[in-house]
Regions:
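Glycine/aspartate-rich loop-and-adjacent alpha/beta segment that forms the canonical ThDP
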Residues: 107-171
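Acidic, Ser/Thr-rich peripheral helices and adjacent loops at domain boundaries
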Residues: 2-3, 11, 62-80, 132-151
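Thiamine diphosphate
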Residues: 1-65, 76, 80, 89-103
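Noncatalytic linker/hinge segments flanking ATPase motor cores
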Residues: 64-70, 89-95, 134, 155-166
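Phenylalanine-focused residue identity feature
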Residues: 6, 19, 69-71, 89, ...
Length: 171
């Protein structure tokens, strides 16, 4: 069966334990889908859900009344809003910076509570003359989508919990 397949691939029980119990992936074209309207409520529930929200537009409408971005906040502010809920791991980063944040991503996946990963995938080629990877890097350098992580379990104060990773001039 399935267990034999995992064994054939050399995947151990310890390897499987590293995967999240619940993984929700929301691609850029589904950010405004009605089923995502309760994302913040789900994150604040304490369930061990890991949520990856990708966005490709930093300038979208933020109003719930417009039917855009069902989370109720602009994509560039989603991670900041989630930090305000407390009690979870939050990581925001452009796709161009994800390899540099692999240790933080691992911590977020390993945490026992909820985690939000908000990733700017870059602007589509039709919106920019740059490949999406380069527009994502430019968004970080310009501070339009800075990289940071917030780990509520990392300590008793903001200095221990919050980190600006790899941003130019983080002060």
């Amino acid at each position: 069966g399935l267990q034999a397949t995992f064994q054939d691939l050399g995947i151990t029980a310890a390897d499987l334990a590293r995967f999240p119990d619940y993984l929700v992936c929301i691609p850029p074209d589904r950010n405004d889908a009605p089923e995502n309207a309760n994302l913040m409520e789900m994150l604040s529930s304490g369930l061990p859900v890991k949520v990856l929200v990708q966005t490709s537009d930093l300038l979208e409408e933020a109003s719930i009344g417009t039917g855009r971005f069902a989370f109720g906040v602009r994509s560039a502010r989603l991670a900041t809003a989630a930090m305000g809920l407390g009690g979870m791991f939050v990581l925001q980063s452009p796709s161009a910076n994800l390899v540099a944040l692999r240790a933080q991503i691992g911590r977020g996946l390993a945490c026992r509570g909820p985690a939000l990963f908000s990733v700017f995938a870059g602007s589509p080629r039709s919106a920019s003359h740059l490949p999406p990877y380069l527009s994502a890097a430019a968004a970080m350098q310009s501070r339009a989508f800075p990289a940071f992580s917030y780990d509520a379990a990392a300590g008793g104060n903001w200095a221990a919990r919050f980190s600006l990773e790899n941003n130019s001039q983080p002060e």
